[in-house]
Amino acid sequence: MTSLQHIINRRDWENPITVQVNQVKAHSPLNGFKTIEDARENTQSQKKSLNGQWDFKLFDKPEAVDESLLYEKISKELSGDWQSITVPSNWQLHGFDKPIYCNVKYPFAVNPPFVPSDNPTGCYRTEFTITPEQLTQRNHIIFEGVNSAFHLWCNGQWVGYSQDSRLPSEFDLSELLVVGTNRIAVMVIRWSDGSYLEDQDMWWLSGIFRDVNLLTKPQSQIRDVFITPDLDACYRDATLHIKTAINAPNNYQVAVQIFDGKTSLCEPKIQSTNNKRVDEKGGWSDVVFQTIAIRSPKKWTAETPYLYRCVVSLLDEQGNTVDVEAYNIGFRKVEMLNGQLCVNGKPLLIRGVNRHEHHPENGHAVSTADMIEDIKLMKQNNFNAVRTAHYPNHPLFYELCDELGLYVVDEANIETHGMFPMGRLASDPLWAGAFMSRYTQMVERDKNHASIIIWSLGNECGHGANHDAMYGWSKSFDPSRPVQYEGGGANTTATDIICPMYSRVDTDIKDDAVPKYSIKKWLSLPGETRPLILCEYAHAMGNSLGSFDDYWQAFREYPRLQGGFIWDWVDQGLSKIDENGKHYWAYGGDFGDELNDRQFCINGLLFPDRTPHPSLFEAKYSQQHLQFTLREQNQNQNQNQYSIDVFSDYVFRHTDNEKLVWQLIQNGVCVEQGEMALNIAPQSTHTLTIKTKTAFEHGAQYYLNLDVALINDSHFANANHVMDSEQFKLINSNNLNSKSFASATEKSVISVNETDSHLSIENNTFKLVFNQQSGLIEQWLQDDTQVISSPLVDNFYRAPLDNDIGVSEVDNLDPNAWEARWSRAGIGQWQRTCSSINAVQSSVDVRITCVFNYEFNGVLQAQTQWLYTLNNTGTISLNVDVNLNDTLPPMPRIGLSTTINKQSDTKVNWLGLGPFENYPDRKSAARFGYYSLSLNELYTPYIFPTDNGLRSDCQLLSINNLIVTGAFLFAASEYSQNMLTQAKHTNELIADDCIHVHIDHQHMGVGGDDSWSPSTHKEYLLEQKNYNYSLTLTGGITT
């Protein structure tokens, strides 16, 4: 019997050569069906779940574990500090130990293969029952995921060891089991040498976090099946190659049938072992090779995910069924043709996203419902591909991708981002076995999934001989799929696809170590013929995804630019309640983890609860499959007619479940609508005609809104879900007619009263009082009602976005980041003085001119001149002239701000882009219209508070008693910019009694090519030193 002391002395968890002991060889997932019918219907599997409540006890280190606890019988009453824990789960999320988040750095001293002596060790125990029938068969226990390494005992006997937290660990318990109650004990070690290969940008969490199953199969059994579909040169007829490994006598046979539902497509194909000569010495005695031809099957693609069922049976010498396995299969062929990645002979455009397995309460333990929700949301938002960043996912995820239709890049659980150099272990022969094990076992497990079209060697671990070995094995074992790997420059010999991360569209990035060309340039390099698919791009951290549409213009223009995978899908925030009972999303450092990278795990298109960020709408729009062109407009008094070309970017499917819903918009409001069926062949253009009867009014603005919605429920969305959208501004449209607002009249003479301290302008409907010293409005009344609660002032500052801060690693901030440059220039801290104020009255109006100087550290940074022109209705025409110091960096914003008293029913109404938040470089998806939302609806609760809620291209704003017209951007919030800047979490935000209103002439873009360098494109930077803008402000008078 192997003692615990012997195991500890052996220290498998600090030996890179030992990645497993006594583990069953990797294979495709098995279920052990008894009949063909059960296998076909996927029922009555002989796999039993051991999930549930297990005993748990946490120790400081492996050496502290009491050996007797692993052997003793389990009593019904927990004792000796044992507690109950859910399996699967991460123990840190059940109050044991603490979560740690780091982006690049390891959370321990780097000295491979050694790990800290203080090494939290969780011991698990549970019991299960074995029947007499099961005892006559083979019984394997399968741990689908344990982080990071573990030893296993059964009935007091040591069984084996395993590491690689993201792949199955399977052990044969057959010789150790008894009829009746059996007990297992698991000692899970938080840090192992395997942790050096798992330095992904995610939470470090531990425990048995995926399913545990007991698989019972007969002594003679199927132990592996490898199914490879192929299509003929016309992509019409198919051939299925099936390789079955068995443990059975030589006179046993293997039968294969293909089912479409309950209908068999062929007679059973029966074959004995050793039926194929593989080299000069002969064939395999335990492997059966079979080929089945299928005429004109339906093809699998992400657009048309049609699946068949392949049932493989083991027959004894009498022809009786002994063991059955079954797999969903899709007939599809992946190729590189003419420098493009193709499926079934057609080039793809990858609308991809990187996805971590993350749940805000359960950490890395994700349920079937969680996976289905993610896949459906991806499909609903026009994603067709997912990269399993950066490890093999739960095995069910691939079945769901097969069924619902997503292309998958399956990635090995290898990342050494914190190593110096990054590729240190990739070039070390001592670690070759660990690298190879992680890759080969992934491929062995997942090889039968139609959805997997690309294998990935891992992420951010440099490039070395170990990668070349993995690549070579892959091309030999599974030549049906390409291999990608970004490390070492994205275009090494270990990748079939140029797969850079965060390369720009047109600009090279300087990097002395590896090339970082623009994606357009990369294609034109001498001798380069591979396609380019960005493995990561458009870093969606917080308020981000600016200029995303630029990528999609390039993808559609250059055939070998075949898309990419956005980083990333969901914010990795963990749910937490503060001492006041307020909920917030936690990130690095919030659990006492002193070594952390703060909020860099918060970079998804969705919040942790899967609520969308505004950036998701931009991604959905840019990636949509239908492209619209307004080709012709014919307008007359009785009927208007519009010809619209609709190009379908679908590659394989007709739009046979779509309808076009159109709306005619007048001054932001729908005045006419209709719908029509939309049936377009893939990769073709259909011209449709829309006729409207609304007569155009002079001075009004007209837009045509187009939405393509589902007619019936689909396998991923309900009827009426909108997949594609567009808006066209129609001819004869003008900006909102200024005559809609009250103009000057000859009634009510304006009086101007001036003292040393104040300047007052008023009549019987309004009153405006300026402070002579500050030059600011102290009081503005309209019909005895207060319009604003604080002065109108210049505003140049925004609460820094993550992209402004340039955060990647807390101890490695970019000194050239926008926030750092703004801070050095004192933006947001300037001292304002009024150098002059004067008023001139005419017969029809009063003009007040105020000049303001802004200083920082005794240096003049800016000067502004405000010219107010007041007529006798109280309407203010405001002109602002801004002159900036030539030494200033590009500004965050140019505009003004004020506050307004909050009312219980405050609604913000505007005519401009909406309804969701949009910024100058992220507004393609937004539509021009008239919107009315509450303050809460305007607010985007970014986990790390920043500037938010902007609406662009506005012409009208109405909040309580304030009305603004002109051309501007605005934001209205219960939180000040200072509060947003100071807060680190949303629970720290305290709503003010007032509304903070920001009216911007110009606002800098959000950027988003990455989040650690100044990535806002030049056309969205405020680099000018002189600005002039005009607005009209009224105190609630409209007609």
Curated annotation (Swiss-Prot):
Record keyword Metal-binding present: yes
A Pfam entry, by short name: Bgal_small_N
EC number: 3.2.1.23
pH dependence (record): Optimum pH is 8.5.
InterPro entries: B-gal_small/dom_5, Bact_Beta-galactosidase, Beta-gal/glucu_dom_sf, Gal_mutarotase_sf_dom, Galactose-bd-like_sf, GH-type_carb-bd, Glyco_hydro_2, Glyco_hydro_2_AS
Active site positions, chain numbering: 460, 536
Binding positions for Mg(2+) 1 per the UniProt entry: 415, 417, 460
Cofactor note: Binds 2 magnesium ions per monomer.
Catalytic activity: Hydrolysis of terminal non-reducing beta-D-galactose residues in beta-D-galactosides
Keyword presence, Metal-binding: yes
UniProt-recorded Gene Ontology molecular function terms: beta-galactosidase activity; carbohydrate binding; magnesium ion binding
UniProt-annotated site: Transition state stabilizer, residues: 356, 390
GO cellular component terms given for this protein: beta-galactosidase complex
SMART domains, per database record: Bgal_small_N
Residues given in the record as Mg(2+) 2 binding sites: 596
Sorted UniProt keywords: Glycosidase, Hydrolase, Magnesium, Metal-binding, Sodium
Chain residues that bind substrate: 103, 201, 460, 536-539, 603, 1012
Thermal dependence: Optimum temperature is 4 degrees Celsius. It does not grow at temperatures higher than 25 degrees Celsius.
Site feature Important for ensuring that an appropriate proportion of lactose is converted to allolactose, where: 1012
Practical uses of the protein: This cold-adapted beta-galactosidase could be used to hydrolyze lactose in milk and dairy products processed in refrigerated plants. It is in fact superior to the current commercial enzyme from K.marxiamus with respect to lactose removal, especially at low temperatures.
Subunit description: Homotetramer.
HAMAP family reported for this sequence: Beta_gal
Family, as annotated: Belongs to the glycosyl hydrolase 2 family.
Protein name in UniProt: Beta-galactosidase
Organism: Pseudoalteromonas haloplanktis
